[in-house]
A protein has these predicted regions:
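C-terminal subdomain of alpha/beta-hydrolase-fold enzymes, centered on the catalytic histidine
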Residues: 1-84
Length: 84
């Protein structure tokens, strides 16, 4: 099983890369965080999704509707990243 996480606005590894990876894997899921950038695993509910995946390794039962409610990442951030 494979869990692929992408941020909709990630300039480094855009969602299209995740889509390409998804096409070559069976038993996988690609979740895209709306209005998110790079490194989304620790933002909002992605931490729980990742934890649930590691616990169950079942991509078909992951509760992922929470990603629709993530706050937008600020356009300008300092060198430490956006505020939590």
């Amino acid at each position: 099983p494979t869990l692929i996480l992408s941020g909709e606005n990630d300039p480094i590894t855009p969602p299209a890369y995740g889509d390409l990876l998804l096409n070559g894997l069976s038993n996988s899921i690609h979740l895209v965080g709306p209005h998110q950038g790079h490194g989304i695993m620790h933002r909002g509910c992605f931490t729980k999704i990742f934890s649930d995946f590691l616990s169950t390794t079942n991509v078909s039962e992951l509760a992922s509707t929470c990603i629709k409610h993530l706050p937008r990442v600020p356009f300008f951030i300092n060198s430490l990243g956006p505020a939590p």
